[in-house]
Swiss-Prot record:
Enzyme class, UniProt record, top EC level: hydrolase
Enzyme Commission designation: 3.2.2.22
Catalytic activity entry: Endohydrolysis of the N-glycosidic bond at one specific adenosine on the 28S rRNA
Residues that carry a glycan: N28, N33, N77, N84, N205
Protein source organism: Luffa acutangula (Ridged gourd)
InterPro entries: Ribosome-inact_prot_sf, Ribosome_inactivat_1/2, Ribosome_inactivat_prot, Ribosome_inactivat_prot_CS, Ribosome_inactivat_prot_sub1, Ribosome_inactivat_prot_sub2
Family of this protein: Belongs to the ribosome-inactivating protein family. Type 1 RIP subfamily.
Positions of the catalytic residues: E159
Keywords in alphabetical order: Glycoprotein, Hydrolase, Plant defense, Protein synthesis inhibitor, Toxin
GO BP, sorted A to Z: defense response; negative regulation of translation
PROSITE patterns per record: SHIGA_RICIN
UniProt-recorded Gene Ontology molecular function terms: rRNA N-glycosylase activity; toxin activity
Protein name (Swiss-Prot/TrEMBL): Ribosome-inactivating protein luffaculin 1
Amino acid sequence: DVSFSLSGSSSTSYSKFIGALRKALPSNGTVYNITLLLSSASGASRYTLMKLSNYDGKAITVAIDVTNVYIMGYLVNSTSYFFNESDAKLASQYVFAGSTIVTLPYSGNYEKLQTAAGKIREKIPLGFPALDSAITTLFHYDSTAAAAAFLVIIQTTAESSRFKYIEGQIIMRISKNGVPSLATISLENEWSALSKQIQLAQTNNGTFKTPVVIMDAGGQRVEIGNVGSKVVTKNIQLLLN
């Protein structure tokens, strides 16, 4: 289990936390030196916990599915909150034992969360101040702000663990929030496709069977077609199996 506290935090403590989160995910080996996540896991071994504390020291404990870094739910004191989906319902049988379970009115995917938040990710600022607010919102479970809070937490933890570029984007926003770059959104959307193509490239001389189009930092469309790309060699840290 891993933890991150905003109180006394720095770029170093955040990077250490993201590194610890990556290491907390069991691996099926590597593909082109990138960690390949497990294709499945059963029982309690399918989950790892992540404790997040705001500047005030208030903490939530988040349950993560180790096969895909998806957030299932979280615990505050003796109450747990889980997304309204079958995977999260299953998780509730193995984590936060003895807690009172509240089922949230939405599932944990971006589309559903954006609909509930009434905002797309492109419009929701990220950064340490945003993370502080998000933890506070979930700690008190403010239902009107919870969906947007999840969008902040997912990107600041899971997405940062998947992509070094996103980790760097959060670090740039330590003192001041900023909306995510187009490249950030694009990498988030294409993680599954990139994971698949990098694995297929093993038997295809390093070439993708189907190129993946992403936006670069300057907002230009870039076609990624092989494992020599910087996205593969320098950026992606985890592969969905």
